[in-house]
UniProtKB/Swiss-Prot annotation:
Xref: InterPro entries: Restrct_endonuc-II-like, tRNA_endonuc-like_dom_sf, UPF0102_YraN-like
Descriptive protein name: UPF0102 protein A1S_1049
Organism: Acinetobacter baumannii (strain ATCC 17978 / DSM 105126 / CIP 53.77 / LMG 1025 / NCDC KC755 / 5377)
Gene3D superfamilies xref list: 3.40.1350.10
Database matches in SUPFAM superfamilies: Restriction endonuclease-like (SSF52980)
Length: 133
């Protein structure tokens, strides 16, 4: 498995742990449709949150949150709409789009299996990062 894939999986698992610590309930991971993918879907009360998770190592251009482009946002929104069509029990929920980002200030070796939790990283959780508008 490539280090980038390992980092992505670690970031999604760590983000889900963080969300659960904040009393969110897991609904789905890596929900796919023809239109795209949503990394995590969680709920709390009558809120349904679609979460994009990004992680970047030092040496990559830009910060992780900058990688959630307008095009990516549109794909996430379309995928969320498909999820709501497929699971109508969630249609009355208030929907929110969050982004959780992990930025590693150090370079990460590309050929070695890593325990990313041992690295220092900056965490940014942006609630309501984008909307349907």
């Amino acid at each position: 498995m490539l280090v980038a894939q390992q980092l992505g999986q670690w970031a999604e698992q760590t983000a889900l742990k963080l969300l659960k610590e904040q009393n969110y309930e897991w609904v789905a991971s890596n929900y796919h449709s023809r239109r795209g993918e949503v990394d995590l879907i969680v709920k709390r009360g009558n809120e349904l949150i679609f979460v994009e998770v990004k992680a970047r190592g030092q040496g990559n251009y830009g910060q992780a949150c900058e990688m959630v482009t307008l095009s990516k946002q549109k794909k996430i929104i379309k995928t969320a709409m498909r999820f709501l069509q497929r699971y109508p029990s969630y249609q009355d929920f208030y929907c929110r789009f969050d982004v959780i980002c992990f930025d590693f200030p150090q370079k990460i070796a590309k050929t070695v299996q890593q325990d990313f939790s041992k690295f220092h990283y900056d965490l940014q959780w942006i609630e309501n990062a984008f909307t349907l508008d």
